[in-house]
Amino acid sequence: MQRLAYENEKLARRPQGHNGEYFVVCTLYYTPKESGFTFARGFDATPVTKPGLHGRTYPRDFLRSVKKEGFGRIVTPVNGRQYIRYNGGGSFGFASHPAGGGGVLVDRYSAAAKLGQSGLHRGAVIETESPTVQKVFGSNRWKIMDTGGGLRRWQIDCYFGEDEPLGPGKFQGRPRATTFEYAYANARILN
C-alpha cells in the first residue's frame, strides 16, 4: 500500500493534480458456483442452512465463499432464482442476478471500489493500463458499480464472472480459470 500512496502523491503534486488519473491495484472478485464445492475437491461440503435460506442446505464452504464474494450460483434454482446473495449480519437470500448498488454485474466490465473516494466513485468508467489485467480479464475498461467492505483506497476489485473455485482454503476466493491475485495499473477516468 505504500507504493499506492507514493504514486498517487506524485500525481496529486502535478500542476493539474490527479486530473482523472490514479495509480491503483486491481484485484479480482467473482461469483462462485455451488457445483465446484465438493468433498472430492477438498472442500467442506457439509450441507448447512443459514437465516434467509428457508431450510435449504448448501455446502458449508460455498456459503463461506458467498459471504466473501457477495453472490453465488446455485445448482437448483429457487422460485426461478439462480443465485444466493449475502445480505450481511449472517443472513442470506435468493436473487435473480449478481448485482451491486449500480445494477446487474457484467463479467469483465463491472468493478467495485471503496466508498468515499473522490474520483473512483460509483458510476465512474475507468480505463486501466496493465498488460496483466488485459491478459487475465480480456478487458481494460471498467465501470464502478459496486462497493466492498474490505476494499482499500485506490483498490479496484474487477468482476471476473461465474466460475467454480480454484481450490479449497485460500484458493476458494479465486476462480478456477486463473491464479491472478493482483496487478498495479495506471487508471484514467473516462466520464
Where is each model-derived feature located?
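Solvent-exposed, well-ordered loop and adjacent helix/strand elements within mature globular domains
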Residues: 6-191
